[in-house]
């Protein structure tokens, strides 16, 4: 594929500045666009994403998109787009997409969807979100779904026009691959924001099952469920085998200290952490939800179990750790699959192709 013209200018908008999947994706995409000769500008709320953009030399503008900022954000985004002379505006997530739609920048809008479900039990909230998504899908020239699971949600639940949906998997900068011929121990790692949807409680409960009694668990990440997870570890009698490590800055080092990665999410539209672990050569066992099955291609590059099933998670993992041949095969397969399907370079090329579709550049 040919590259975009070197003078193409892109405004990337996201309403989240945390160190989670969406902001990580936007930062990686901005780096890929810059490397290809485009000029990206990230617009996001104050927070860690702003700081990381500045550290990496990515142009960034900080603006509030909640509270009082909700009302003023469309005007500020329109001004920002015009000052940047954006040839395309690209929103990520419903809040950013809605604000950018209301901004009426005059530039074609691409919107990336990062959810494959409603994530609320309230019928009223579902109805509101469905309406907002339908309006957004009509307003944006093209939609990007980060997995087939997200694309199916858009067409089946939201009613999006499948002809205007492009599936582009999130991409990562692969970690250095260290092939493993056998596990050094029985250390399992979970790297996630500590929220209910990530299923970290399932990982803790897995240690209390018969198959999990020989396992130790390293938990990297922060979030609102920390206290409840610590209490759970004591309640089920596994606190001596659970290490809460807090925010992890060096993911390569984290994975090097594990023999297996778990991604026990209850819902996962994509699953960047699975890609990161696989790229390092660390075998992965994950929930059979959302984009995780697409990433792992079980049983070739990873293993999956039914979600919210601690016994199955522990049993499958113990079996893998006791099978050096299969363990080594998964360790070897992971980096190659990430290189072919989930690299940041591939994501950047395909995303620039979408920009060409809507701009003609």
Walk through the language-model features, giving the residues of each.
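N-terminal strand-loop element at the rim of the active site
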Residues: 12-72, 223
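Short His-centered aromatic/hydrophobic patch
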Residues: 91-97, 113
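Nucleotide-sugar donor phosphate/pyrophosphate-binding loop at the beta->alpha transition
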Residues: 71-75, 108, 117-139
């Amino acid at each position: 594929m040919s590259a975009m013209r070197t003078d193409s200018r892109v405004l990337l908008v996201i309403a989240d500045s945390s160190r989670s999947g969406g902001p990580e994706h936007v930062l990686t995409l901005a780096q890929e666009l810059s490397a290809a000769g485009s000029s990206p500008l990230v617009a996001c709320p104050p927070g860690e994403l702003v700081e990381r953009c500045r550290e990496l030399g990515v142009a960034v503008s900080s603006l509030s998109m909640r509270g009082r900022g909700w009302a003023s954000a469309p005007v500020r985004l329109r001004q920002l787009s015009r000052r940047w002379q954006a040839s395309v505006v690209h929103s990520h997530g419903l809040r950013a997409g809605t604000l950018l739609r209301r901004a009426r920048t005059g530039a074609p809008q691409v919107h990336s969807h990062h959810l494959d479900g409603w994530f609320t039990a309230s019928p009223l909230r579902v109805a509101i979100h469905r309406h907002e998504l339908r309006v957004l899908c009509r307003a944006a020239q093209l939609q990007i779904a980060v997995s087939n699971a997200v694309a199916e949600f858009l067409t089946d639940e939201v009613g999006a026009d499948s002809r205007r949906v492009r599936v582009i998997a999130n991409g990562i900068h692969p970690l250095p691959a260290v092939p493993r011929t056998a596990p050094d121990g029985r250390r399992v790692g979970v790297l996630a924001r500590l929220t209910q949807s990530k299923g970290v409680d399932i990982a803790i409960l897995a240690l209390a099952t018969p198959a999990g009694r020989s396992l130790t668990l390293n938990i990297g990440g922060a979030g609102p469920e920390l206290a409840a997870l610590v209490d759970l570890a004591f309640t089920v009698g596994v606190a001596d085998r659970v290490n809460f490590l807090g925010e992890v800055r060096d993911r390569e080092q984290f994975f090097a200290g594990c023999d297996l990665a778990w991604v026990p999410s209850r819902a996962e539209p994509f699953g960047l952490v699975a890609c990161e672990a696989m790229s390092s050569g660390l075998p992965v066992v994950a929930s059979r939800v959302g984009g995780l099955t697409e990433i792992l291609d079980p049983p070739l590059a990873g293993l999956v179990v039914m979600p919210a099933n601690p016994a199955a998670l522990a049993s499958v993992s113990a079996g893998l750790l006791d099978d050096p041949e299969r363990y080594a095969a998964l360790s070897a397969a992971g980096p190659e699959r990430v290189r072919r399907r989930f690299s940041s370079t591939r994501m950047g090329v395909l995303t620039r192709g979408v920009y060409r579709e809507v701009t003609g550049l």
